[in-house]
């Protein structure tokens, strides 16, 4: 049995030299932002600053607030990593990554700026006409009217009275509390759970199915492999380094997206990627955009660039090549799958008269037929790992992508072999890093013990809608849609409560969202900064950043390598409060504080989470330090046994599919699904199928809108988080979100790096700063996801966004009736040079405020 002293030894043994220089003071983030490479232990992942980017303009001030805390060094954490916060004179001076972080994030100094951000929500605020008229003010003025500062008591009274009014008049189903978003790290300060805890005590709310990240894949994969596939531990990187003979990164860029974790991270994937690189494993990156990971693997990585949205056609053609050349692993197909005959009949053209040959696919995807054939044979002949990303399924008919990946891997026969098969979470939260022996750390639940006024949080009145369809729901109450084999009728949403998220960055078709957002009677937002979502709210509640409160979190969503004490570094700035304080006070107003708190304060809850985990660890033979020891040290790390380092995804299934069946109806991989066939959906057949999207490079409308738009993840942000910090602002061009464009396309349009372009789709237009690069197909452009919406005309639909918010351009239709996922990457645009005057970016400064009597 390991004792607590052994655990501290584990922590010491895990320590490696920090790979970044000592961080500078928060206000001098200019130098940190200039760093153009991310240093991994033993190697470098290239993140080049592309030509045309401007020097950082510190035109916005990040004033340091006041604090009563003295000089100190405290431990804290965020989605970007674990760090020591240096406080001097009550102000954050810098953040230093912990010495055992394998690849410290470049964003730490941006995090240090968060409490002092120019866009910080400083006080409780209410839209002027709403303060005067309440819900009768209507939604017309949202996004354009000034705000009035109010007291916390007034703001919470308004929220409490509205929650009660809407519940009593329309029922709790009329309150939308899905509140999707990444929030801040921390198991207590979970903004969404705390908010939903209050809503549940109030009788319930309408929630959502799924998420934006994996809307299609997480619905289709349970039919195919019996589990969601996208949020599961992956075959260990160590196994890949030893056994994998070909790594195929299809639409994935683990160097960018593994900078963050749903909890916190010490970037273990960096070590895994280094092992794979040193082992000399050949890598193929399939992506219209050359990923940073391809730069990391260098000459050992080949880049194949299909047209966006055509991956399924390319994979089906690979299946045709394997079948007609006699290379399919028929023993694997026979033993571990069902439905192959019906699928291959479609591939060979027996169903529709069209053989899905590599030559057929070349006309669709733009990849040469010979290259498609070669890739098919390489994947069959070598033990290959198909590392699938998520952006490729954020598209119309996106369900087909990961289904077809599984089928292709099955035809190659490597599923369940060490280092082979498929993995759909290597690029997320450091999937593939070995899992420790420690128990999962608990957190605050959205489901409290009791209800209020006889109303339980469980009830038939509650509704759930697909997340990406909430705009459609707001606009069309009573409408019935298909979803995953059932019918859903939209409720009539009268109140929206969003906490710790930014739907104006997440939801497609911003102009459609503006129209929908104005329909409910009341909108409430609780956040730390003035996102567009907050600017379009009636009531705005200022929350603390994670540097201004206490919390606890675990290290690694999959690895669970340790726990971190998130110690308060500075006092809450202005009149912000912790999310727990906000919702405790709201519950007090509503008469159920006791049920909300269960008699515990913030440190009481944190202690409960830790000590419950310690009890479970003890049962499993692991002795954790006392809570007092843990909190004083700031963290504890856990051992990883050898079995975890040898983990092989679906290995048990391959060894014995009868004893270890999958969770599908057949217990096997379902290439053809009878269940999906029974739904009779016209947009999601019963086996993987190529279907043309409404918008793609092969559509008629591409004559007017000739560029496919990719909305890839930014290395400078987590979705829209950190958009107003110096690190992200440095990446901008002329203060605009960049648009990446190929040199050939730029030449035809008369564009060069450093110019500003107007990018237009059928939904709207944005301004973006031009970066010319050969890392993108000539017929494709990239505007990275998450730039804040900054309209030319406040609150108006259809106005020009002058900052480069990608979702102004994207289309808002369901991927199919099966998952109703979002389709952000099924968008066509046109581009023209912008020579007119440039409007200032207002998204990163305070909104207009007035006095109540003005």
Task: Please report, for each region that a protein language model flagged, where it lies by residue.
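Long, contiguous, secondary-structure-rich segments that constitute the structural scaffold
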Residues: 573, 578-633, 720, 726-740, ...
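Extended redox/cofactor-interaction regions of prokaryotic respiratory oxidoreductases
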Residues: 190-275, 279-286, 293, 313-316, ...
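Active-site phosphate/pyrophosphate-binding segments
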Residues: 318, 339-469
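Short beta-alpha connecting loops at secondary-structure transitions
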Residues: 299-305, 561-572
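N-terminal export/assembly segments and adjacent metallocofactor-ligating motifs
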Residues: 2-327, 368, 586, 747, ...
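N-terminal leader/propeptide and maturation segments of large enzyme subunits in energy/redox metabolism
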Residues: 130-154, 327-367, 569-666, 670, ...
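Catalytic or ion-translocation cores adjacent to nucleophile or general acid/base/metal-coordination motifs
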Residues: 531, 544-568, 779
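Acidic/polar loop patches that form or flank catalytic/metal-binding clefts of enzymes
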Residues: 207, 328-331, 372-373, 385-386, ...
